[in-house]
């Protein structure tokens, strides 16, 4: 009954594609089709393929989504400090490939805090014909004295630093690891009405 959309979340399978692994591309598409059919039947409003480290696996999930569902799809990869995915894909290549396959929004999530994500967003924006997503962590993770992972960026700082991503060209905004309701509320306060918080 509210204004929020419910997204069906899809991520990495943990399996490697041949020749490095034992799964071929068509099998991977079938794995994603099964998940997407269930999410579609459950009534989600859109699909989010996120925290992807491999462009190949992201392609498989997007192809599967387009074959078995008419729902909008957001595709989001994680990038290392060198602005490449773990498998070596740069942001411009990711954007060009995924928008050509029919993604409705392409971007980046997890990986870093807001300030370190700007380079990825800028590169994507250079070739984007669709909206760009930026969904960073609340800073970089650290281990506390008890060995637990903590994120130290407070909500107010997160909101301020998200302005940098807006300036870099992000249209869809959100928070990943370490973010709380307070972080998202801070983000809503800095966002223009034309931007979507996800």
Predicted segments, located by residue:
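Active-site clefts of carbohydrate-active enzymes
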Residues: 133-149
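Non-cysteine beta-strand/loop elements that form the S-adenosyl-L-methionine
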Residues: 7-10, 74-76, 130-138
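Catalytic cores of alpha/beta
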Residues: 160, 182-183
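Histidine/acidic-residue-rich catalytic or RNA/ligand-binding cores of hydrolases
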Residues: 117-121, 144-152, 184-185
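Single conserved hydrophobic/aromatic residue that forms the stacking wall/gate
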Residues: 188-198
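Glycine-rich nucleotide/cofactor/substrate-binding loop typically near the N-terminus or early
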Residues: 1-7
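Alpha/beta enzyme core
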Residues: 17-75, 81-131, 156-168
């Amino acid at each position: 009954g509210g204004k929020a959309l419910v997204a069906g979340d899809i991520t990495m399978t943990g399996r490697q594609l041949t020749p490095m692994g034992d799964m071929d591309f068509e099998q991977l598409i079938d794995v994603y089709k099964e998940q997407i059919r269930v999410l579609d039947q459950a009534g989600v409003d859109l699909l989010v393929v996120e925290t992807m480290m491999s462009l190949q696996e992201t392609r498989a999930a997007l192809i599967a989504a387009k074959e078995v569902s008419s729902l909008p799809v957001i595709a989001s990869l994680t990038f290392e400090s060198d602005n490449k995915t773990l498998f070596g894909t740069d942001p411009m290549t990711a954007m060009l490939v995924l928008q050509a396959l029919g993604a409705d929004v392409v971007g980046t999530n997890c990986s870093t805090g807001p300030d370190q994500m700007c380079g990825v967003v800028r590169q994507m924006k250079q070739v984007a014909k669709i909206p760009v997503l930026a969904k960073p962590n609340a800073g970089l993770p650290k281990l506390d004295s008890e060995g637990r992972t903590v994120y130290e960026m407070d909500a107010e700082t997160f909101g301020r630093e998200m302005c940098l991503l807006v300036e870099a060209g992000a249209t869809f905004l959100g928070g990943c690891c370490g973010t709380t309701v307070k972080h998202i509320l801070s983000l809503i306060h800095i966002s223009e009405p034309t931007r979507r918080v996800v």
